[in-house]
Amino acid sequence: MLDLPPFIAPQHYTDADAALAQVRRIYDNSVAHLREAMRRYVADADESPVVRRARACYPLVRVRTDSANRLGNANPVSLSYGFVAGPGRFETTLTRPDLYADYYLEQFKLLLQNHGVELEVSTSTQPMPVHFSFDEHEHLEGTLSPARRALLRDRFDLPDLASMDDGIANGSHEPAPGEPQPLALFTAPRVDYSLHRLRHYTGTTPEWFQNFVLFTNYQFYIDEFVRLGHAEMANPYSEYTAFVEPGNVVTRRAGLPTEAVDAFGAMPPRLPQMPAYHLMRADRTGITMVNIGVGPANAKNITDHIAVLRPHAWVMLGHCAGLRNSQQLGDYVLAHGYVREDHVLDEELPLWVPIPALAEIQQALEKAVADVTQLAGADLKRILRTGTVASTDNRNWELLPGNQPQRRFSQSRAVALDMESATIAANGFRFRVPYGTLLCVSDKPLHGEIKLPGMANHFYRERVDQHLRIGIRAIELLRQNGMDQLHSRKLRSFAEVAFQ
């Protein structure tokens, strides 16, 4: 027997704010229902003789269109999202309207503007896993005995992987006859799953993440970012409002009052696997920096989850092996192509799919190098090389017999090699998140220059500060150029979903 909250039938809206308010109402009712049922279960206070399964479902938004054309007041040249691909019925489940309010509101407004149709909002038939209904600081299930915990599956819906795969993003999803077409890349359970994973891997809650993300594979960059973040907080005129570190430790800008949420922050006893740091702006266009560690598995893992936040761009700042003898230690490499020997995305994104360079990101990175180094023309080209970056899953590729990798890298015209950049770019392509890569040459193993401890430490001290300032400057340029220019139509498929 099911214990359900009241079902809310479809209601039609031509006002985006009203539609969002209804989404909130349905979501809040579902969450409250599951939390109360869990509290009764933990307290063993359910006196009903009949075993009742508590269930609540996510809100749903739907649009129906009769034409492939968009309204005359829409500019089809500038649009890369906000419209459906043709006539039909399109829908998606939604979650966390508190976190996604601005995002949902923009998507709703664009659909109304581009198609002139009504938005239908109702309760869906997709159950909400009880784990995804808990508040950030609630851990009710932790007090359950092993026997009671084993019975959870009989009383509540648990996460179901079948409802959260990436078929839509991968382009392999085929609706059955009579089923609606997707309106977004991610279903609500998939989003909730990643939001919970982000807490685990980064040590910070999703609310702190900003819309521009820098990835690095060295703690040296994080140390410098932390120093810069605290310096910004000491400046009462900084454009940034807060700096957040793992454990949700919040430092507010000088002159700003603390907020209630700050009291929950505490430095963790040890850093999480991929710690994240957030230099925040009031409009969420600040900078999040994540130390992803080493290897393509980490790179795929973190980008799989950050993608549900729909950032405006992510950029890899890391070290690489220079493959050309003409390169010097400390030179920069701006990737305009990738050799994917990482193998972690082969099933989701076939190797025959090219990963294009995105002009908006490339131009911002090149200008940032020029701005920070104060070089131009031939002097700039001397330290900045544009070319193909190869990424491998074999850290000791140099030891393979017969010069096998060297031959492939030469045939591909690669100028640099690392273990993460191609993965981050490929997942950006797969998830329609604008991406870029700017690496710094830290060794040249094909030419006898390998990393040694003393040399490496000196090199890091010399270059990390400048490289990070280049990355931050690139983000500033992207922000100044506007988000409308950033989301490239190069990332759209033939039958793209409407949501960004």
Show the residue positions of the predicted features:
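Accessory terminal and edge-of-domain segments that mediate assembly/interaction
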Residues: M1-A313, A321-Q500
